[in-house]
Design a protein with these regions (language model features):
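Short glycine-aromatic motifs
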Residues: 33, 106, 130-135, 350, ...
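Extracellular structured ligand-interaction cores
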Residues: 64-66, 105, 319, 376, ...
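Short amphipathic beta-strand/extended segments with alternating polar/hydrophobic composition
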Residues: 78-86, 114-124, 133-134, 329-336, ...
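Protease-associated
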Residues: 92, 96, 103-180, 186-190
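Conserved oxyanion/phosphate-binding beta-strand-loop segments in alpha/beta enzyme cores
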Residues: 135-168, 257-280, 367-396
Length: 412
């Protein structure tokens, strides 16, 4: 409600939404708004992605079990490569193992005769006696094939179940070998799409395993199925080690459900394209306390990613984009434009929210009708629009807005 209690702005009002729509259309015209398929923080209970600042509100230090698992190399009898993860539920989605090209690896012989490959700097994870047989770089391991933990035909192609190079592999923890589940990690997705790994989900948006997953976990929530996944690997002599750790993990700030990093279709704002400009402007701002400038806020700007704007909810400002089956799309920037482009005359009371807005179809040049993309937008975009949307700018109060903008003082 701001300080002016006699003239509050309310984000659910049509005037406010119309100003937000105008701003989104301006971004669209500048090629700053785009649709993309990426891995985003996702709440399986709320059924929607979260923005980076929403995620930052829900981190907790949790104590849980990490696991070390052996992957059997195909061409060498009794040879395995060791990988580590804190998210065993992603194992059914495994399609590759990543190594660092310049990292040093060793092949060791264990007391039972099996041979194991892991990072040289991570030998401390081994139990008991072992003998180093060979040393090599990660580059020498690239291309080796291994047997999948689970036979899921949808995840098989010419590139899957091989050792691949990746620039994010380290020996700070784990084994120097990263298990890749393309659909459940930002780095995994980036490297997976680059080399053509299968982009197939084993988990649904509700956090439950799909029917392509192994039968014993189908239809079960990921965290509830983790123990059975570990026991299954143990019975097959693939679970090498369990280890309790404390690590920071994000939970939904609304419902306290564990978040997934989940590949999904969403609309994005190209924040990365204006990152440099935002950092320059930040230097001109007087922050109180001053450490925020180069600390919390400065660090956020430095690593700012494209903003996942879509939310898969009922309540919120609707994304004003309509699309036809032929592929044509239209973004609406005002109520007047909506009336003009609607396939039927709009009469009666206008409510820009769902479900009213989804009854509006637009005329397409192909002769068919366009339907609105059903997403709503991140409520933080509504909040960030207050500077202009409270005045119903640019439809009203232009002078009032221009007199105040840019604002001299912002209290957060």
């Amino acid at each position: 409600y701001w300080v002016d209690l006699k003239n509050p702005y309310v984000t659910l009002d049509n005037n406010y939404i119309e100003s937000v729509w105008w701003s989104l259309k301006e971004l669209y015209k500048k090629d700053m708004l785009y649709e993309g398929y990426k891995v985003v923080p996702f709440c399986p209970r709320c059924g929607t992605p979260l923005s980076s600042h929403e995620v930052a509100q829900g981190y907790k230090d949790v104590k849980e079990e990490s696991v070390y698992v052996t992957f059997k190399l195909k061409k060498e009898k009794g040879e395995y490569i060791l990988a580590w993860t804190t998210t065993p539920w992603t194992f059914p989605g495994n399609v590759a193992l990543a190594v660092g090209e310049k990292i040093k690896y060793v092949k060791v012989k264990l007391p039972d005769g099996d041979k194991l490959i892991l990072g040289k700097d991570r030998l401390n994870v081994l139990h008991g006696d072992y003998k180093i047989l060979e040393e090599m770089t990660g580059k020498e391991l690239i291309g080796l094939e291994y047997e999948p933990l689970y036979n899921i035909k949808e995840l098989k192609n010419k590139n899957s179940y091989k050792i691949i190079p990746a620039d994010f592999v380290t020996t700070e923890d784990g084994t120097g070998v990263v298990h890749i589940a393309v659909m459940y990690g930002e780095d995994d997705y980036r490297v997976g799409t680059k080399i053509g790994l299968p982009e197939i989900h084993t988990v649904g948006e509700d956090g439950k395993f799909l029917n392509i997953a192994p039968e014993f976990i189908r239809g079960r929530f990921i965290k509830e199925a983790e123990e059975d996944i570990k026991e299954n690997l143990k019975k097959r002599h693939l679970l090498f080690k369990r280890e309790k750790i404390v690590h920071s993990y994000p939970f939904c700030w609304r419902c306290d459900t564990v978040l997934l990093y989940y590949a999904i279709n969403s609309w994005y704002i190209k924040v990365s394209e204006v990152r440099k400009k935002m950092m320059e402007l930040n230097e001109k701002i007087n922050w109180y306390p001053s450490h925020i400038k180069d600390g919390r806020f400065g660090n956020w700007l430095e690593g700012a990613k494209d903003w996942a704007l879509s939310r898969f909810k009922f309540w919120g400002t609707p994304l004003p984009i309509w699309r036809c089956d032929c592929g044509n799309e239209e973004i609406i920037g005002s109520i007047e434009e909506l009336k003009k482009k609607s396939s039927k005359k709009i009469t009666g009371k206008i409510d820009l929210h769902k479900p009213w807005i989804d009854e509006i179809k637009l005329k397409c040049s192909c002769g068919k009708e366009m339907k609105r993309i059903p997403d709503v937008i991140d409520c933080w975009y509504d909040s960030g629009s207050a500077g202009f949307a409270q005045f119903h700018y640019p439809f009203e109060n232009k002078k009032e807005f221009e007199k105040r903008f840019p604002y001299d003082f912002i209290s957060e």
